[in-house]
Amino acid sequence: MNFRELDTSNGVKAAESSFRTKVVLAREIPWNGFASSNSITSEQYNLISKYDKHTDAEKKEKFAANSASYVNFFVNFINSTSNIEIIQYLLTLINEIIEIDPRAAGAFSKITKDDDKSYPYSVFFRLLNREDAYTNLHASIALAQIMCAGKPTQNDVESFFNWILKLLRKNNSSEVEVGLIALQSLLLKDDFRIFFNNIDGSALLLNILQALSTSSVNIQLLYETIYAIWLLTYNKDIAAAYSGTGLVANLVQLVKTVAKEKIVRLSLSTLRNLLNNGKSNEEMIDNGFVRMLNILNIKKWGDDDIPADIEVLINGLAKDIDNMSSFNKYKTEIISGELEWTPVHKSERFWKENISKFEENNYQVIKHLHQILKTSQSTPLQLSIACHDLCEFVRHHSRGKAIMTITNQTRYHGYDVKSNEEVKNQALFALQKMMLNNWEYLNAK
């Protein structure tokens, strides 16, 4: 899936939808003319004239008092007309009343037709095939909300999810976005989360997220993708299944690199859902998320949900760190970059008991220590500790110097002239220890 050069000639972006909705609702539909031509009955005319162009509060009151009549009028008129402007208008009214009063979706789900077992879903399914992006989007939103409130057949559910999957596999960003928005409404219901996961939808969303993470960022599409994943992770089994897939690493990277607050908020909320599921905690720690959380915790945020999520994540991961072995705590410190002169660095016992563990994951910890020495942004404290610990590894591991040469070239000589006295001392001390180590080796020969 390539999001680098997406065709956006068709479809409708969510960011544009609000503007389009206002344009559609500004239309003057000639209800009086329909009544005069007997296209609608006088009762239907009275019904719609008391509703259309009124305030939200008035619409809510009118709909609640006569919901069955309004539902039948909206759906049957859409089903009987070919006028795209009227179809768009009525779809917008349907989604509007469901937004004003979510209970309205239940009223739409109860409408039936003797010769159509799929009614009213069949009406909206036909609109999904229209060559009109606005109609596709608003028909899919209405259909998803009505399905969540009703009891659709298995065939209807499969048909709708298959339509969504086709959109999610497109290279057209706007079509993908329509699929995501329709999906989000469905994922409010746990049965639909499970269904979507069973048809490999969870993996498909992760693929989209990974593709977006490696291209020039389409913020709105990124937001819609994370939003869908966030809804999925309210199911504990799905949250646990995401462990080990790379989702945690992707979300942590987005928190680190994307400045948009809405992306940070949604990424943190998703990570909060993943907390304590599978090996997600370990993945967060291994990806240096603890350090990132501490940085985020001192920032001021416009959204109150962000500090709340940060607090939950910090406290949740702190419990895991407390339960870690001394080596795992040490590894977490090195990988996160939050280096301090904790007792383990200078503990002879620690180095003797844990030296073989430095071989794990292809010398992951050693490579991180090397990276600290190479990075110009490393602080004097980080450089000092990295020099010290690499030296201790060479001193305690039987093949330490050879491994250091294989994994990376040591760079102590580049740092012993640094202006910082602590770094200079640690680099010189490291060289002395390494030379002593070689001398002891030669004497043993």
From Swiss-Prot:
GO cellular component: contractile vacuolar membrane; pathogen-containing vacuole; phagocytic vesicle; vacuolar proton-transporting V-type ATPase, V1 domain
Keywords assigned by UniProt, alphabetized: Hydrogen ion transport, Ion transport, Transport
Pfam families tied to this protein: V-ATPase_H_C, V-ATPase_H_N
An MF annotation (GO) of this entry: proton-transporting ATPase activity, rotational mechanism
Tree of life domain: Eukaryota
Keyword Transport tagged: yes
UniProt-listed PROSITE patterns: ARM_REPEAT (PS50176)
Its job: Subunit of the peripheral V1 complex of vacuolar ATPase. Subunit H activates the ATPase activity of the enzyme and couples ATPase activity to proton flow. Vacuolar ATPase is responsible for acidifying a variety of intracellular compartments in eukaryotic cells, thus providing most of the energy required for transport processes in the vacuolar system.
Family: Belongs to the V-ATPase H subunit family.
Subunit and interaction comment: V-ATPase is a heteromultimeric enzyme composed of a peripheral catalytic V1 complex (components A to H) attached to an integral membrane V0 proton pore complex (components: a, c, c', c'' and d).
Name of the featured protein: V-type proton ATPase subunit H
Organism: Dictyostelium discoideum
Name of the gene encoding the protein in the UniProt record: vatH
